Amino acid sequence: ISHNMETVKRITPLVRSAARYETSLEVIRQIADSGITAKSGIMVGLGETPEEVEELMDDLRRAGCQILTIGQYLQPSHKHYPVAEYVTPAQFASYKETGLAKGFDQVESAPLVRSSYHAEKQVQFYKKETK
């Protein structure tokens, strides 16, 4: 089951006014504690630092999250939160490497990744694990 964190702790109140960072972590924790594979996704390019992304990864791992997707935030319209930066492919690769080193089973990290990116591959991974 996926519950997207969307962004790092500092930026959450700016882009998710109806959601709290800690509440989202608790949702992930409850999913994982139920024995269900927990997945989350975040957008980068909102002004976060790599250190904040790593802190978010640590929080997700402590909550039991096993799959992480990381994609570039794209401003849907001029009324929405602006893009602070376009993250480089090298930084996306670094996020993937860091996430795997932190213990995520799977990390998809690239500019056009969305939370459903390669979902069929993720399902197949866990089907193999349960046989």
Model-predicted segments: where are they?
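Core AdoMet radical
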Residues: 1-27, 39-43, 67-69
